[in-house]
Regions:
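Glycine-aromatic micro-motifs
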Residues: 2-174
Length: 174
């Protein structure tokens, strides 16, 4: 298993939601946009996780609760440090999502890779109660019938309401 690519400044990243090809934020993974990236292939997590679509903005959330849910299918990329930092900023790591190493199996070769994956470490119970069923794969136009709301639109709505997505989603620390 390998965590980094051939160069020390390159990392494997697994994306499962709106960053996948054909999804609303696919441009983030484009090579040269905030760093270098290269598509490696499709993959599936070795362990199951809860993947849901929830909140009024229909955001896909991978909950850090291994062993529950389903094995998740997604895409693996090799990224440089600049792209990894850009992804950390996008995912608000470590304040909202956390970036952890998980093992995936590449679909084409059957090879296993340790990859970085962004997960929600804690959440309010309402996130599950109001969310979709556990998914194995996310598609913004999927059978869950929950159309994704773009970031700029939800930021405007949250600002008008006077709070943030973190307040809506994350369980307060005790």
């Amino acid at each position: 298993m390998s965590t980094v690519a051939s160069k020390m400044s390159e990392f494997y990243v697994f994306v499962y939601g709106t960053l996948k090809k054909g999804e609303p934020n696919e441009m983030v993974m484009a090579d040269g946009e905030g760093g270098r990236s290269k598509f490696v292939g499709f993959a599936e997590t070795c362990r199951p996780f809860p993947l849901i679509v929830s909140t009024q903005f229909n955001i896909p959330f991978l909950l850090k609760d291994p062993g529950k849910g389903r094995k998740i299918t997604g895409e693996v990329y090799i990224v440089d440090e600049d792209k990894l930092n850009a992804l950390d900023e996008l995912e608000n790591h470590p304040h909202f999502y956390v970036r952890d190493l998980e093992t995936v199996v590449l679909s084409e070769s059957g090879e296993t890779k340790d990859v970085w994956i962004y997960m929600l470490p804690e959440w309010r119970e309402e996130l599950l109660l109001n969310g979709s069923e556990f998914l194995a794969s996310y598609n913004s136009e999927g059978a869950h019938n929950r159309k994704y709301v773009d970031r700029y639109l939800r930021t405007q709505q949250l600002e008008k309401a006077g709070h943030t997505l973190i307040v809506e989603v994350r369980q307060p620390r005790t």
